[in-house]
């Protein structure tokens, strides 16, 4: 399941805001004859309606399973190992983060998308195993522009907002943007020594 919010910025101002909620579940049914069938369904978060959908799906699996061929390679663990891992949602305050972003973009032409949300995954089987994992994070993918319409692309993603980390990334981007604002120099054909950042070298290797 996913619950996330997003905000689109343009010229340092909030232009659009929205949210996304998605819930899906996969049912897997097996028998002693090594037959197995799966089905994935979308749920809407309404308990009675979702239960009805899951019961119909389970009945479908029970009806179709006997007609399937056996899978001689089918194996599954019979040991039970239950776990529960949950992150602290309070470490992310969308309003506080956006207020700081808007303040930092006061004199900048900033364009980007801020998104934050929760991911939930769980597993349960007829042997009694229960596994649950929830995680919370945010991502701010953005670019800053100068008057020549040159841009520097930046990203800050984490599970906990840190003002110093964000400011460091932004200030480094501003420094690079200032360099792009310098007068252009035409380089004639010839042999030159060139320094490539690790990220630039990685892109070249990926193209090979």
What are these regions (language model features)?
Residues 4-62:
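N-terminal alpha-helical targeting/anchoring segments
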Residues 12, 125-129, 149-150:
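Detector for glycine-centered tight turns/loop "hinges" at secondary-structure junctions
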Residues 23-40, 96-113, 142:
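Short, charge-rich amphipathic segments
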Residues 152-153, 203-206:
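Short helix/loop capping segments that flank catalytic or ligand/cofactor-binding pockets
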């Amino acid at each position: 399941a996913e619950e996330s919010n997003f905000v689109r910025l343009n010229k340092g101002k909030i232009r659009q805001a929205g949210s996304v909620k998605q819930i899906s579940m996969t049912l897997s049914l097996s028998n002693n004859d090594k037959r197995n069938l799966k089905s994935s369904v979308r749920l809407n978060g309404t308990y009675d309606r979702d239960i009805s959908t899951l019961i119909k799906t389970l009945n479908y699996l029970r009806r179709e399973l006997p007609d399937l061929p056996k899978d001689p390679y089918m194996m599954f663990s019979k040991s039970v190992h239950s776990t529960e891992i949950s992150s602290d949602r309070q470490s992310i305050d969308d309003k506080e983060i956006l207020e700081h972003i808007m303040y930092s973009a006061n004199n900048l032409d900033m364009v980007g998308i801020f998104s934050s949300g929760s991911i939930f995954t769980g597993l349960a089987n007829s042997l009694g195993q229960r596994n649950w994992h929830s995680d919370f994070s945010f991502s701010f993918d953005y670019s800053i522009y100068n008057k020549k319409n040159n841009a520097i692309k930046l990203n800050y993603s984490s599970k906990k907002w840190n003002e110093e980390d964000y400011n460091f990334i932004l200030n480094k981007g501003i420094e690079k943007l200032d360099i792009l604002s310098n007068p252009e120099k035409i380089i004639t054909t010839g042999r030159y020594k060139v320094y490539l950042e690790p990220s630039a070298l990685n892109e070249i290797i990926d193209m090979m």
